[in-house]
Amino acid sequence: MIKKRGLMALLLILILTYACKKTYETVPSDVVINELMPVNSTTIADNYGEYDDWIEIFNLSTSTIDLSGYYLSDNHKKPSKWQIPNGTSIVGKGYLIIWADGDSTQFGLHTNFKLSSEGEEAVLTKPDLTITDKVSFPAPTGELYYSRVPNGTGSFKWQSPTFNKSNNAR
């Protein structure tokens, strides 16, 4: 009887563990991470003249999308690290640059985290924390950009800059 209760308790624990397990699946979206630069010391300066890491978001649709309340993070287990401010939108087929400089007190779109030069991930989530895009990137060799080719839909590769432009325009 004791053995049976022990097995039942173990089974219950396993079922509850499985049922409560959080999954981090990516849900397709019209808004994607299109390009990022984890090492930027001389290439593109932000509005403060600082050469910071950055992430480019691309809108695959032809309609403007309101990004108010979306989140960016460098860790899918902590998807709500930095919230995109209210009133932020991206036009159809347009680009949005967000500086991943660890200084969210600066005016404009500046996150409270930096991208690692050792390689890591960039994660875009909806306000309900549904992951819409997640990009894992290796350590770069020099000041290269990790870009999606073809633009918005393809796989990622290290290449020369296409800041705020189509990655197909080479």
What residues fall within each predicted segment?
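Bacterial Sec-dependent N-terminal signal peptides
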Residues: 1-27
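Intrinsically disordered, low-complexity linkers and terminal tails enriched in Ser/Thr/Pro/Gly
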Residues: 17-170
